[in-house]
């Protein structure tokens, strides 16, 4: 057993999990449950009353957090301590939205001035492009941005840009390319005019396989359409640490933005990786996004554990994963603009907490990161919600909805809200056999048929959910929401004693992929790998099955 599972608090939680009453009983016993189990901060409202939790549950979870020294670990992150121990790096994405501009030390120096310089450089770049001052090689202004990245440098900018569609004020179009499948970039290029297109390549090394391949394809297209090598600087910019490679490619050094080792890819949208966002919504709105995230940082760093939104959400998710065998967690966004958030939170959580050893290398004897998935309400209600209501797996859910719509048409938003709240109620209370029989009482069915159908209509309920609300989706509230999930992820990793900031599984995939690529291009059939890999490579080389 690990230290965590040996703790008396862990053992108490395990025993306590067997004694939790049904949520119907909890609500019936305490009419003030909603008031007691909800809180507001940073423009967000969290209702966590529809959880299998009592005051004793929460007290035990908070005690577990204290035993794990969560307070100290939070302080260590914000202070710039080396908490990514396997890569010997600080974790300071919070510094990117540090609007207070207090001194933050990383690698022996105050990083705040460079962060602010980069924001100012972004401001100049955005102004130049959006004002029409930046000209392409034929003298035309830029109309289209193509953001080329992978992982965090792709998903963050894409999802945030999509979410903030009502704030697109610059008149530009933006296209996102990540997958190395040639179809992805080919379909984008078909829509574009090389004279008015600006590519932004995001890769720390300027060598990430997918990103470099797509960028080289974009450059070849640009040159084939009439541009010259000397024109590349007018149509390509980069976010990278490798200035030498970027300038060698043809990018002007003035249009190269930095990346830092103390910012992981999945936490990087707040940096110059967010240039596509800023080019669409303008720098004032981009700074508002940072402001909202900073507000959540401040709340996370300073609020007591018992009133701390990321802490409460993280602990409740851990509660279900470790004591109820919940293997997945669903995120349901009742706002069309937020439809991409489940995929973003999927990467954030699963890449961070998909680990199986503790910081000292001990194999864990408890579940860590769950599968994160989800989608857009009300679409999901006609698909996978059936499994949430009557399936055999326990799947905790987060419902996210703005109270006000950017498009208040007729009763659309009223219906959306009623569906959202109705789903949380249905998951919580379910439907008993007696209730199902009562619904069938006036039907022409026989009593035997009524009983059979009623059994199929029974729903156990007691399915946990959180509801997150905001007045309206704005850059500020979106920033706070994303930072909330970042810190929720941190909380779980801190208690599980794992490193939430490396990704060795991703690195292994890259290494083996490069090895396979070499064998695909070899002159002879593959024979030295396992039989399956050899067979697949050789089938691919033949081009037919």
Curated annotation (Swiss-Prot):
Database matches in SUPFAM superfamilies: SIS domain (SSF53697)
The protein, known as: Glucose-6-phosphate isomerase
Organism (species): Shewanella oneidensis (strain ATCC 700550 / JCM 31522 / CIP 106686 / LMG 19005 / NCIMB 14063 / MR-1)
Top EC class for this record: isomerase
Principal place of residence: cytoplasm
Lineage: Bacteria, Pseudomonadati, Pseudomonadota, Gammaproteobacteria, Alteromonadales
EC number: 5.3.1.9
Record's keyword annotation contains Manganese: no
Family under the similarity heading: Belongs to the GPI family.
Listed Gene3D superfamilies: 1.10.1390.10, Glucose-6-phosphate isomerase like protein, domain 1 (3.40.50.10490)
Catalysis: reaction(s): alpha-D-glucose 6-phosphate = beta-D-fructose 6-phosphate
Cell compartments where the protein resides: Cytoplasm
GO biological process: gluconeogenesis; glucose 6-phosphate metabolic process; glycolytic process
Active site: 351, 382, 510
Task performed by this protein: Catalyzes the reversible isomerization of glucose-6-phosphate to fructose-6-phosphate.
Pathway participation: Carbohydrate biosynthesis; gluconeogenesis; Carbohydrate degradation; glycolysis; D-glyceraldehyde 3-phosphate and glycerone phosphate from D-glucose: step 2/4
Keyword Isomerase: yes
The encoding gene: pgi
Gene Ontology cellular component list: cytosol
Molecular-function annotations in GO: carbohydrate derivative binding; glucose-6-phosphate isomerase activity; monosaccharide binding
Assigned keywords, A-Z: Cytoplasm, Gluconeogenesis, Glycolysis, Isomerase
